[in-house]
């Protein structure tokens, strides 16, 4: 019998971690993963359903797999809208929602029974990873308790469920032992970690620690590898993490989605609504840890956003001088409460505001990177090509931030650290030579 499974993982890093866990279980049970639809006995698709374009990509992928294979199991965020999938592809074998690991594996068993003898010994202790060997995503919780009006994640993934502290730290330790040099800490709401457990005390390596964000960062920092924080909601206790960055325990990098600067828009989004307080906190973080890199994301064209309110966002951007910024045009996600707000912004105006926003941030980024010329930086080597080496500094997360380009040199390996001198820059990337 064919025990080969095709697997497609769509969406964000959090979905990628879900895929890794499903694949680890399947491999442990003797299944073989194959890269083509034609060779697979069944195809599993982990979908994204956050915005309309992601829904369409997921549906297109399902249709493609159905056309080329015909035996498809669907899971992930879009699985929460089974009727949407069934309407587009009525013959899929099984549909489940996000982080339904056991349900997916059981569905594979149903339509493609496992081999008689599992091959658990072939699975590395850290499990199967879909990232390069030198970095890995570490998911610390599921779900979210926030009620942001532009978002439907709580509907798809439920309320906050923090993973046990010992489980997270054990996984992190195994990843380090497997050669991982950088952990990217992720969840839907990273800084809420432990709230749902009431900060339960647990034993870890002979000492008592609390199930809370600060303690988790502190313990991860003791591993002695890069630890990078993503999706950090701006709760007041986030301020307590910055000294850990200053002291070198975790990377001086904070990914903190702010979404807007105008108080009326923020209230309509159900987000923290004081840009003045945010600017004061940013100044405080930089005073405590001058090397901190601040990344954020914003939404333009939110329903009712006026030109004056958008101009306030641009003014905030110029004053905050954030290092890394992403921008999204508001997308009316089905089921989001923001869709019911008055005065939707036209697509033309959204597009125009998006480009104005990115022009302002490009200039900020260009000037910040120019100031790094002549400095010495520690970089992590990501790729070695025929004519150049591609690396990242402490300021650069994979996939979403800039890169550091080096001339091809012998003796350098992927996944190693190197000391470099910055020699040039552009809007988003740096160029360097080895020390």
From Swiss-Prot:
Recorded family membership: Belongs to the methylthiotransferase family. RimO subfamily.
Top-rank lineage group of the source organism: Bacteria
UniProt keyword Cell cycle, yes or no: no
Protein known as: Ribosomal protein uS12 methylthiotransferase RimO
GO cellular component: cytosol
Pfam families: Radical_SAM, TRAM_2, UPF0004
Annotated GO MF terms: 4 iron, 4 sulfur cluster binding; aspartic acid methylthiotransferase activity; metal ion binding; protein methylthiotransferase activity
Co-factor remark: Binds 2 [4Fe-4S] clusters. One cluster is coordinated with 3 cysteines and an exchangeable S-adenosyl-L-methionine.
Record-linked InterPro entries: Elp3/MiaA/NifB-like_rSAM, Methylthiotransferase, Methylthiotransferase_CS, Methylthiotransferase_N, Methylthiotransferase_N_sf, NA-bd_OB-fold, Ribosomal_uS12_MeSTrfase_RimO, rSAM
MTTase N-terminal domain sequence ranges: 3-113
Swiss-Prot/TrEMBL keywords: 4Fe-4S, Cytoplasm, Iron, Iron-sulfur, Metal-binding, S-adenosyl-L-methionine, Transferase
Catalytic reactions on record: L-aspartate(89)-[ribosomal protein uS12]-hydrogen + (sulfur carrier)-SH + AH2 + 2 S-adenosyl-L-methionine = 3-methylsulfanyl-L-aspartate(89)-[ribosomal protein uS12]-hydrogen + (sulfur carrier)-H + 5'-deoxyadenosine + L-methionine + A + S-adenosyl-L-homocysteine + 2 H(+)
Organism: Legionella pneumophila subsp. pneumophila (strain Philadelphia 1 / ATCC 33152 / DSM 7513)
Role: Catalyzes the methylthiolation of an aspartic acid residue of ribosomal protein uS12.
Record-listed [4Fe-4S] cluster 2 binding positions: 144, 148, 151
Compartments where located: Cytoplasm
Sequence ranges assigned to domain TRAM in this UniProt record: 370-435
GO biological process: tRNA modification
Binding-site residues for [4Fe-4S] cluster 1, renumbered to this chain: 12, 48, 77
The EC number(s) this enzyme carries: 2.8.4.4
Radical SAM core domain ranges (all copies): 130-367
Listed cofactors: [4Fe-4S] cluster
């Amino acid at each position: 019998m064919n025990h080969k499974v095709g697997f497609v993982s769509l969406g964000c890093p959090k979905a990628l971690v879900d895929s890794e866990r499903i694949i680890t279980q399947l491999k442990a049970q003797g299944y073989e993963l194959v890269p083509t639809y034609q060779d697979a006995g069944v195809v599993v698709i982990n979908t994204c359903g956050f915005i309309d374009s992601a829904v369409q990509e997921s549906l297109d992928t399902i249709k493609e797999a159905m056309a080329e294979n015909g035996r498809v199991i669907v899971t992930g965020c879009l699985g929460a809208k089974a009727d949407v999938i069934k309407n587009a592809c009525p013959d899929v074998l099984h549909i489940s929602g996000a982080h339904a690991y056991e349900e997916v594996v059981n569905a594979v068993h149903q339509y493609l029974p496992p081999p008689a003898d599992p091959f658990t010994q072939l699975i590395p202790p850290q499990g199967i990873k879909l990232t390069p060997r030198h970095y890995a995503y570490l998911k610390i919780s599921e779900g979210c308790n926030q009620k942001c009006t532009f978002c439907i994640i709580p509907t798809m993934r439920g309320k906050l469920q923090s993973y046990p502290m010992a489980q997270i730290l054990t996984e992190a330790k195994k990843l380090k032992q497997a050669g991982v040099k950088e952990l990217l800490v992720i969840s839907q709401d990273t800084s809420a970690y432990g709230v749902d457990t009431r900060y339960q005390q647990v034993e870890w390596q002979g000492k008592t620690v609390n199930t809370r964000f600060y303690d988790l960062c502190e313990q991860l920092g003791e591993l002695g590898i890069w630890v990078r924080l993503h999706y950090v909601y701006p709760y007041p206790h986030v301020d307590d993490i910055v000294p850990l960055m200053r002291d070198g325990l975790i990377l001086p990098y904070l990914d903190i989605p702010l979404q807007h600067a105008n108080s009326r828009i923020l209230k309509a989004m159900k987000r923290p609504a004081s840009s003045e307080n945010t600017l004061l906190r940013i100044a405080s973080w930089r005073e405590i840890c001058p090397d901190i890199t601040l990344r954020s994301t914003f939404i333009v064209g939110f329903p009712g956003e006026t030109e004056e309110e958008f101009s306030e966002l641009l003014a905030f951007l110029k004053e905050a001088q954030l290092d890394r910024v992403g921008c999204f045009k508001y997308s009316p996600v089905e089921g989001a409460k923001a869709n019911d707000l008055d005065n939707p912004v036209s697509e033309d105006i959204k597009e125009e505001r998006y480009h104005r926003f990115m022009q302002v941030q490009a200039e900020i980024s260009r000037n910040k990177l120019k100031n790094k010329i002549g400095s010495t930086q520690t970089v992590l080597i990501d790729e070695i090509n025929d004519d150049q080496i591609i690396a990242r500094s402490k300021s650069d997360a994979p996939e979403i931030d800039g890169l550091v380009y080096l001339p091809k040199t012998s003796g350098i390996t992927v996944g190693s650290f190197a000391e470099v001198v910055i020699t040039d820059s552009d809007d988003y990337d740096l160029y360097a030579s080895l020390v």
